[in-house]
Amino acid sequence: MDNNQSSKPYRKGVIAIVIDMDNSFLLIQKIGYKDSEWNFLGGGREEGETLEQNLFRELKEEISSERPDFEIIGISTHKIEYDYPSDTVLKVHGGKYRGQSYDQVVLRFIGNKDKLVFTTKEFRGHKWVKADDLAEHLTFPNQYENHKSAINELLLDIIK
């Protein structure tokens, strides 16, 4: 990364690590992902949004679910932060950011799963998986390790 890029801010966002009452994790598969590639819900923060506003806007946009359907378990101290590759930085968000910085929030879904509607055209699938199966689904470089830190921090006593 050149010196000009290193002075730019990170684009902030949120990752929603959602578990259900059976301690299964909600994963989504975006269009364009390989069959083995999955992720948690989330997205970038809009100008002036708080972390919580960002979180619940993304959940509403992506799964049509409202705030009363969730209990926040915690916000991890482990952020996911990365720089865009130098050949990509100008193509993403007009070169305004050097990379992304995501807060990881763990939530329990307490609503009715039958009412979840995956509204975005970004997804080709979703599933609920147990903690023991996360590593085989979170296959992007360092993805499992990054999320595992938040899960261990906030859920270790819950998912034993």
For the regions a protein language model found, what residue spans apply to each?
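Conserved N-terminal beta-strand and adjoining loop/helix that marks the start
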Residues: 2-25, 41-47
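Anionic group-transfer/hydrolysis microenvironments
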Residues: 22, 31, 132
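A conserved beta-turn-beta hairpin within the catalytic core of GNAT-like acetyltransferases
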Residues: 33-36
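Unchanged
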Residues: 45-142
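Charged phosphate-binding loop/patch that engages nucleotide di/tri-phosphates or the phosphate backbone
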Residues: 136-160
